[in-house]
Curated annotation (Swiss-Prot):
The lineage of its organism: Bacteria, Pseudomonadati, Pseudomonadota, Gammaproteobacteria, Enterobacterales. It is found in: Cell inner membrane. One of its GO terms (molecular function) is electron transfer activity. The keyword Transport applies. This is Thiol:disulfide interchange protein DsbD. Required to facilitate the formation of correct disulfide bonds in some periplasmic proteins and for the assembly of the periplasmic c-type cytochromes. Acts by transferring electrons from cytoplasmic thioredoxin to the periplasm. This transfer involves a cascade of disulfide bond formation and reduction steps. It comes from Yersinia pestis. It comes from the Bacteria.
Length: 595
């Protein structure tokens, strides 16, 4: 017994006193051990985000079981139907997660369930579901796309604003899914509620091209007959407004119906960018850079038709209102065009007709007041009307930001909103300098405070952007686009070891590698004799999938090392984030990669 105990003590001492090389021999190479441990701690994407679906009649149920220590990005979930139309749905609120590079984002942990109504589905209809997530330990998976076949669902009625789906057409439902490249579902309503449409119409009535015309229009409505009672005056004014509203409503329905036929095309990023440019041009006209209106010959003819109607009669007043809806002044052309373009892009007939009706109703309310009470309740004309017109220019500028947010993502969307808000508050502050009342000083302080607050995203972008640029300016990667190009570069490496960094914009840890690891002087000196390659797989296309599959890459960041013969040194592979000290030690423990 004593002999066994002494033998055990001697064996333990020999292990503790063994040199470093002996330890490596006992446990295997240190880099290899670390790599195996790193590989084993990350699970395949199907296990990290177990996805399931089932259809119950006209409802599609989607569910994700999220493994502990992993999370899904809310903004990276998109639903795109093929030969089907989906009803309105919204993603549940996620958990706020602060990201150094993307700011405040929302994520899902543990479980996510979506219930999506199907308004119609043709034969061989399907829905593609795309999602993307990461591990908390610093590892991100490429976006996953699953195609779900749908059972046939017959639309309840075509009058509800949803067109029938034929067997060859691809219809993206309005206000339910993203265009290609977008990150989050499109809201189920227009960005402006019906109340906003009404308020915009009222505001347009106080522009310099509209308000001075109301007394004249009021006189035309009443005609030259004997004085009317207040009740009769109210009826005539309301009938005129309803005639004008009818024209706008029909215009909204026609444009929305046309947009519905081209819904898929109107969701394309290039189309969204084109619409955004048009909105910017329309907004510039509100700032007085140029004037938009119907040709003068057409306006003259419409005015003659309107004047030929007999004032004071219900039919004549209604006809005058309908024709007035077609006569656009320079102050109303740009807002009306912006609303029509957005309605066409949304493709929602109910929202299109309703929005234009409320817009016309808003423009008509001041006219009813003028007709009933004269000019007593209407403010005097002055420079303030031009300021109202310019303010609506900023309202129109909000529409391109809303559309570009779908193409550029939430991060750039936040920066654009910040830029627009800075411009608006700056404009308002400059206008306030023209006033000298005491209370205006308080408004100026509030405007300055608001200006500083809304400028924060731009400040973060500027300073972080400069920091990142300075951090990575000394690292020099040679880009490779696909597997054949990589193989060609490896064949021409001239006996040098090669490091391949697999990078993507959606990989947060990849950006951390750039900022904190590759920027380190010691790391750069260690890699001085290594050929540095980088493959940007952000698009996650077929070529990228082939490259990742070739090397059995689960996700990013992943860094591969190749010897002088072009063979991967599997023991040196890095999976997941390493800071500069850890990565430097990894390189030093694997001399073959930096010799």
């Amino acid at each position: 017994m004593a002999q066994r105990f002494i033998t055990l003590i001697l064996l333990l001492c020999s292990v503790l006193l063994a040199p470093h090389s002996a330890q490596s021999s006992l446990f295997g190479e240190n880099a290899s051990f670390g790599t195996k441990n790193s590989q084993s701690r990350f699970i395949p994407v199907d296990q990290a985000f177990a996805f399931d679906f089932h259809q119950q009649g006209d409802q599609l149920n989607l569910s994700w079981q999220i493994h502990p220590g992993y999370y899904l990005y809310r903004q990276q979930i998109k639903i795109v139907p093929q030969q089907a139309a989906l009803g309105a749905f919204t993603l549940p609120e996620g958990i706020t997660h602060h990201d150094e590079f993307y700011g405040e984002v929302e994520i899902f942990k543990q479980q996510l369930t979506l219930k999506i109504p199907i308004t119609q589905a043709a034969e061989q209809a399907s829905v593609s579901v795309t999602y993307q997530g990461c591990a908390e330990a610093g590892f991100c998976y490429p976006p996953e796309t699953r195609v779900i076949p749908l059972d046939v669902v017959v639309a309840a009625s075509t009058a509800s604003g949803t067109a029938a789906v034929n067997s060859s057409a691809t219809v993206n439902p309005p206000a339910t899914t993203q265009p290609e490249g977008d990150a989050t579902p499109v809201p189920s309503t227009l960005p402006f509620s019906p109340l906003w449409a009404l308020l915009i119409g009222i505001g347009i009535a106080f522009t310099p091209c509209v308000l001075p015309m109301y007394p004249l229009i009021s006189a035309v409505i009443l005609g030259r007959e004997k004085p009317h009672s207040q009740r009769r005056i109210l009826i005539l004014a309301v009938v005129y407004v309803q005639g004008m509203a009818l024209t706008y409503t029909l215009l909204g329905l026609v444009v929305a119906a046309a947009g519905l036929q081209f819904q898929a095309a109107l969701q394309h990023p290039y189309v969204l960018i084109g619409l955004s440019v048009l909105f910017v041009l329309l907004a510039l006209s509100m700032f007085g850079l140029y004037s938009l209106q119907l040709p003068s010959s057409l306006q003259t003819r419409l005015t003659q038709w309107s004047n030929s109607q007999r004032g004071g009669s219900l039919a004549g007043v209604f006809a005058m209102g309908a024709l007035a809806g077609l006569i656009c002044s320079p102050c109303t052309t740009a807002p009306l065009s912006a609303i029509l373009l957005y309605i066409a892009q949304s493709g929602n007939m109910l929202a299109g007709g309703g929005t234009l009706y409320l817009y016309a109703l808003g423009m008509g309310i001041p006219l009813v007041v003028v007709t009933l009470f004269g000019n007593k309740l209407i403010p005097r004309s002055g420079p303030w009307m031009q300021y109202v017109k310019e303010a609506f220019g900023f309202v129109i500028l909000a529409l391109p930001v809303f559309l570009l947010e779908r193409v550029l993502g939430d991060v750039w969307g936040l920066r654009l909103w910040s830029l627009l808000a800075v411009a608006f508050f700056g404009w308002a502050f400059v206008l306030s300098l023209k006033a000298h009342a005491g209370w205006v000083r308080v408004c100026q302080l509030l405007l300055l405070a608001a200006l500083l607050i809304v400028a924060r995203p731009l400040q973060d972008w500027a300073f972080n952007g400069n920091t990142q640029q300075n951090a990575v300016k000394h690292i020099n990667f040679q880009p490779v686009a696909n597997l054949p190009q990589l193989q060609a570069v490896l064949a021409q490496a001239q006996g040098k070891p090669v490091m391949l960094d697999l990078y993507a914009d959606w990989c947060v840890a990849c950006k951390e590698f750039e900022k904190y690891t590759f920027s380190d002087d010691k790391v750069q000196r260690q890699l001085a004799n290594t050929l540095l390659l980088q493959a940007d797989v952000t698009a996650n296309n077929a070529e990228h999938a082939t490259l990742l599959k070739k090397f059995n890459v689960l996700g990013l960041p992943t860094i591969l090392f190749f010897d002088s013969q072009g063979n991967e040194i599997t023991a040196a592979r890095v999976t997941g984030f390493m800071d500069a000290a850890q990565f430097l030690q990894h390189l030093q423990n694997t001399p073959a990669v930096t010799k």
